[in-house]
Amino acid sequence: MIYECEVTDIAPLRMPKVYRVKTVCGDKELELELHEEIVEAPKIGTKIAVTITNNKEECLNNYFCAHGYVVSNTQIGDIYRVVISLHGFLVVIKSKVPLEHKELEHFYIGVTYT
């Protein structure tokens, strides 16, 4: 699945050189935690494509590619939330409709600035 997103906020985290990118992707919101020495922080308003796939080769076509596992699939109020851990860096998908990702499911996450 490819999410076409727009960056709405960038916030530094307590861990040095790590930042959180908040995006809006149509009817979903994505938050990504990234390290500035690996992925340069985008600017607010930047368009990015986030690919979530089971295919490593598809992921490798992106500017950034990592793999990880779904660690949480919950509903908080009327928002469904899936958390994918990229070995400690988190990707959070928020939606008003249930998401079909299962806990411990393996994914590759690709990010490209468009």
Question: Could you say what each language-model-derived stretch is?
Answer:
Residues M1-Y80, S85-T114:
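Mixed-charge, low-complexity intrinsically disordered regions
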